[in-house]
Amino acid sequence: MRKLFVFLGVAFMAIGSVVSAQEVDSMAPLQKSSWGDAKTSDTVEYIPDISLDMRGGFGQDFSGMDGRFNGDGLYLNIDGYISPNFSYSFNHRIASTLYTDNSGFNGTNWLTLTYEIGDFSITAGKDGIFLGSFEYDAADLDSYCEMNSIFYKNFDCWQWGISGGWYPADGQSILAQITNSPLSGGFGNLYAYALAWRGEWDCYESYWSANLWQYDKGRFEKSLNLGNRFYLGDFTVDLEYMTRGIDANMFTDDFTVMVKPAYEWEWGRAFAKFGLEKTLLPDYEASNTFVGAGAEFFPLKENKDIRLHAAWSYNEACFGGHYLNLGVKWNLNLTNALKQLLSKL
């Protein structure tokens, strides 16, 4: 924790010097692309965006009658640009109940350097494996893991590697990636390969991927993942199919199917979820059913930096029964806070 405070102190001083001395000169032309939309931006902001995300609350496991107040996680985010073409992104778990080891780089979800030119990008560093699932793609503190699949809880997604992106049209991304294999068990010369497509239209969004995860020399586990999100006014519906295996039986022996409808309004969101799963994982070789429902509320009119939530779930593999999660998530933008402080001096 002392290292964190030292780091934040240095970061604050660096931001302060940049804000006070170079605020006007910190803008320059940029060709910028996101995962789904390669588009031109007129300016680039060299001041890093530093923020903290936190979530905590009360959880009640009804199967074991075990209830307690707890903190779900404290995350540090740093994003910025080194030049008009080079950007970086950093997300680190200062504390988290979702992972057993948060020390050193084990506590880093991603640490990437990206070079963008035209409709192409190259990214190197630690990143999430491309996997076509909106359940998997959600941020840790935006996900209620007690209503998620067994695969979500057991897949070691954060890996070192390199990836490339091609953005042929607005809202379209073709992504390729090579990383260390999540099935390597710590051994070298075992790699994972991913080819993904993300598309976005007014009424539909896709995230599909084909994956190979090497577990021995010349031996791979294959995976096909089809994430689909439909937009119907204020309603969204996620429909996902994921399958894994080493032979043609993968489509019936190891798979996950999920449906998640949601309704969103100005100051809140309500959602439900239903999933069926069959897995050949060594620790849990069985079928699983998981269901849940919840609501999120945003008490601030000007932004969504504070979120209240209540979520119920039933997950046979996770708790063997019902679970209730009540809590709050909040975001503190340290860069904006320092800018406002300096503007008053």
Task: Specify the residue positions occupied by each region the protein language model found.
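Transmembrane beta-barrel architecture of outer-membrane proteins
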Residues: D53, N70-L74, N106-W110, C157-G161, ...
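A structural preference for long, well-packed, hydrophobic secondary-structure segments
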Residues: I15, S87-Y88, R93-I94, F155-D156, ...
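Positively charged n-region of N-terminal signal peptides that target proteins for export
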Residues: M1-L4
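Outer-membrane beta-barrel pore domains
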Residues: V24, I47, R55-M65, T100-D101, ...
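Short, electropositive alpha-helical surface patch
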Residues: F105, S181-G185, G292-G294
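Beta-barrel outer-membrane channel/assembly domains of diderm bacteria
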Residues: S20-I122, G164-Q172, H309-S313, H322-L345
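Surface-exposed coil loops of outer-membrane beta-barrel proteins
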Residues: E23-M27, S51-S63, Y99-D101, S121-R198, ...
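Bacterial N-terminal signal peptides
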Residues: L8-G16
